[in-house]
């Protein structure tokens, strides 16, 4: 896939979100309205550019004739480096798809996250490994989670008490991360459900 411009990414994300929420793609007029274009024709130009880059297909003769091609890729999406403040599964973070059966993991894995660093090495999560993640916010103390603190994404063991969260490493060379929920933005992105040693499934 060719890289998208910022504007093209906005159009693509809007189409994908609209399909996810309503079950159908938006019209050109809806795209123009949502993104502040002067006319549906401007939206049409962006759609043509997306079609040339191979991420959508335009079905002629239908006001909602847009089909996402990216969504047809099978396997689990692999998330690489996550830019500050952006959704974990934003299209630009997905490096590719791995042909891994999600049901190999309990609960099922929704995506893979490329591990950066050695803070969890004592439980076998190494730098460059692919962490299988179940997307949920329903987690318990003691579980290994993917968490976002302000704009940073990290993998740690969870310990929550009142307004304080400790994210514990599994490596004595690293210190716990302490989060004050009254002052910092904290989100659970998912639960770690398994590890694929990088290269094993390529």
From Swiss-Prot:
It holds the Pfam family LexA_DNA_bind. Transmembrane segments: none annotated. CDD domains: S24_LexA-like. Residues 28-48 bind DNA. It catalyses: Hydrolysis of Ala-|-Gly bond in repressor LexA. The keyword Iron-sulfur does not apply. It is an enzyme of class 3 (hydrolase). InterPro entries: LexA (IPR006200), LexA-like (IPR039418), LexA/Signal_pep-like_sf (IPR036286), LexA_DNA-bd_dom (IPR006199), LexA_repressor (IPR050077), Peptidase_S24_LexA (IPR006197), Peptidase_S24_S26A/B/C (IPR015927), WH-like_DNA-bd_sf (IPR036388). It comes from the Bacteria. One of its GO terms (molecular function) is serine-type endopeptidase activity. Its EC number is 3.4.21.88. Keywords: Autocatalytic cleavage, DNA damage, DNA repair, DNA replication, DNA-binding, Hydrolase, Repressor, SOS response, Transcription, Transcription regulation. The record marks 84-85 as: Cleavage. The keyword Translocase does not apply. The active site is at residues 119, 156. GO terms for biological process: DNA repair; DNA replication; negative regulation of DNA-templated transcription; proteolysis; SOS response. Belongs to the peptidase S24 family. PANTHER family: LEXA REPRESSOR (PTHR33516), LEXA REPRESSOR-RELATED (PTHR33516:SF2). Represses a number of genes involved in the response to DNA damage (SOS response), including recA and lexA. Binds to the 16 bp palindromic sequence 5'-CTGTATATATATACAG-3'. In the presence of single-stranded DNA, RecA interacts with LexA causing an autocatalytic cleavage which disrupts the DNA-binding part of LexA, leading to derepression of the SOS regulon and eventually DNA repair. Homodimer. This is LexA repressor. It comes from Escherichia fergusonii (strain ATCC 35469 / DSM 13698 / CCUG 18766 / IAM 14443 / JCM 21226 / LMG 7866 / NBRC 102419 / NCTC 12128 / CDC 0568-73).
């Amino acid at each position: 896939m060719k890289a998208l411009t910022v504007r093209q990414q906005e159009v693509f994300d809007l189409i994908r979100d609209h399909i996810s929420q309503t079950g159908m793609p938006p019209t050109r007029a809806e795209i123009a309205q949502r993104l502040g274009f002067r006319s549906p024709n401007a939206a049409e130009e962006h759609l043509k550019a997306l079609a040339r880059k191979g991420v959508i297909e335009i079905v002629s003769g239908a006001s909602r004739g847009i089909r996402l091609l990216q969504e047809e890729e099978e396997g689990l999406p692999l998330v690489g480096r996550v830019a500050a403040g952006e959704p974990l599964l934003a299209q630009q973070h997905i490096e590719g798809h791995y042909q891994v059966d999600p049901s190999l993991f309990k609960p099922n894995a929704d995506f893979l996250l490329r591990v950066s660093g050695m803070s969890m090495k004592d439980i076998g999560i190494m730098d460059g490994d692919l962490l299988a993640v179940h997307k949920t916010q329903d987690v318990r103390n003691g579980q290994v989670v993917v968490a976002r603190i302000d704009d940073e994404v990290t993998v740690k063991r969870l310990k929550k008490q009142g307004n304080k969260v400790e994210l514990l490493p599994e490596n004595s060379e690293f210190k716990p991360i302490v989060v004050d929920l009254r002052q910092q933005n904290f989100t659970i992105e998912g639960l770690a459900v398994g590890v694929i040693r990088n290269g094993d499934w390529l």
